[in-house]
Swiss-Prot record:
<dbReference type="InterPro" id="IPR050053">
    <property type="entry name" value="ATPase_alpha/beta_chains"/>
</dbReference>
<keyword id="KW-1003">Cell membrane</keyword>
<keyword id="KW-0406">Ion transport</keyword>
<feature type="binding site">
    <location>
        <begin position="150"/>
        <end position="157"/>
    </location>
    <ligand>
        <name>ATP</name>
    </ligand>
</feature>
<dbReference type="GO" id="GO:0005886">
    <property type="term" value="C:plasma membrane"/>
</dbReference>
<dbReference type="GO" id="GO:0005524">
    <property type="term" value="F:ATP binding"/>
</dbReference>
<dbReference type="GO" id="GO:0016887">
    <property type="term" value="F:ATP hydrolysis activity"/>
</dbReference>
<dbReference type="InterPro" id="IPR036121">
    <property type="entry name" value="ATPase_F1/V1/A1_a/bsu_N_sf"/>
</dbReference>
<dbReference type="GO" id="GO:0046933">
    <property type="term" value="F:proton-transporting ATP synthase activity, rotational mechanism"/>
</dbReference>
<dbReference type="InterPro" id="IPR027417">
    <property type="entry name" value="P-loop_NTPase"/>
</dbReference>
<dbReference type="InterPro" id="IPR003593">
    <property type="entry name" value="AAA+_ATPase"/>
</dbReference>
<dbReference type="Pfam" id="PF00006">
    <property type="entry name" value="ATP-synt_ab"/>
</dbReference>
<keyword id="KW-0472">Membrane</keyword>
<dbReference type="InterPro" id="IPR055190">
    <property type="entry name" value="ATP-synt_VA_C"/>
</dbReference>
<comment type="subunit">
    <text>F-type ATPases have 2 components, CF(1) - the catalytic core - and CF(0) - the membrane proton channel. CF(1) has five subunits: alpha(3), beta(3), gamma(1), delta(1), epsilon(1). CF(0) has three main subunits: a(1), b(2) and c(9-12). The alpha and beta chains form an alternating ring which encloses part of the gamma chain. CF(1) is attached to CF(0) by a central stalk formed by the gamma and epsilon chains, while a peripheral stalk is formed by the delta and b chains.</text>
</comment>
<keyword id="KW-0139">CF(1)</keyword>
<comment type="function">
    <text>Produces ATP from ADP in the presence of a proton gradient across the membrane. The catalytic sites are hosted primarily by the beta subunits.</text>
</comment>
Amino acid sequence: MNEGQVVQVIGPVVDVEFASDRLPDLYNAITIKTDKINITMEAMQHLGNNTVRCVALSSTDGLQRGMKAVDTGQPITVPVGRATLGRLFNVLGEPIDNQGPVETTERLPIHRPAPSFEEQQPSTEVLETGIKVVDLLAPYAKGGKIGLFGGAGVGKTVLIMELIRNIAYEHGGFSVFSGVGERTREGNDLYLEMKESGVLEKTALVFGQMNEPPGARLRVGLTGLTMAEYFRDAEGQDVLLFIDNIFRFVQAGSEVSALLGRMPSAVGYQPTLATEMGALQERITSTKKGSITSVQAIYVPADDLTDPAPATTFAHLDATTVLSRQIAELGIYPAVDPLDSTSRILDPRVLGEEHYQVARGVQQVLQRYKELQDIIAILGMDELSEEDKLIVARARKIQRFLSQPFHVAEAFTGQPGVYVPLKETIRGFKEILEGRHDNLPEQAFYMVGTIDEAVKKGQELM
């Protein structure tokens, strides 16, 4: 057993002295255990004089100089496999849901290399989500990374839960949710809502919330990722990985960097910002065995998209889903902005000509409606040309048809949720663009699944 001695404690940073020939490797887990204390730390720097600087992953209250610290000889390992589904973990992979120990012998280290060039599968397959606005206008690629933007109360959590539900029930896939530095109350709400809506048993949850020391918030993303990698590599699954919030990962890195005495770079962020982000993001990919598709909520500090944290994240994204308060105010949910959301695979070579043309057609009509709104506000609808009146009518139908009832919101809306297959989505919008449903009232298109439901609802209304 390789034992050292604590020589200095400054907040979450602890210096430990070892024998000269037995220095622990970087990233090794180092534990300090007494009757009252049980702390795991990670070796971060070799300082010289046989001293290792460590970052603690839990509170360092009660630590004293001279205490014994033990090098475990390996990085932090976390439980993986099906036993993790339906459970709630902390950064060390310890269950925190009072449901007893996890029934698994499989454990993996949280620091692992990204899949090599040969193992990667550059697939440009669409991941069908069953959510019309996403599948049509900003489709997700299997193994892609999606940024989810939205302020408070526009429906990020509900959208995340619906995605988890659809992947679980329609594709039989699993999800991993990593709560990084967000509010504990929100994590608790999510856990209880998932329990109620029945998606919990298909999901592993890992939390390192705002009250945790920066070391825990920096590593909790890797803990969730390691669990997701096991489902991809050992079980050949298409896994969904949610990270909420990727900005807090950067923020924790910046705190740790300052504590370790590194010179800050732009806007006070860590000099290793791009490296840390890359080490996490490069492990999220498609391999020949399976894929990890990741949806990352992105907080934009002071709405400044040029801030180094969001700017570094953008370099890794394949698609963005932007939730808009204006759309939520119209009562259209999911409140995805059809003109602001983007996708790298919105390309006829990937999606096929029909899907691409319909998507672009929908965007053109909505864009024209946006331009005409000022004229309508000042002069009224009557001043528009016949052609523009038709565009406005179709745009309003499209806008309403982009809404749909969610399974996970059934308890609140009283409406059964719908999963809309991609072909049905394309057919529906194509028919609206062609003017086949110009005679139906726009209310018929609100909160329905397929176009057939809209027609039926329209006939009942007329």
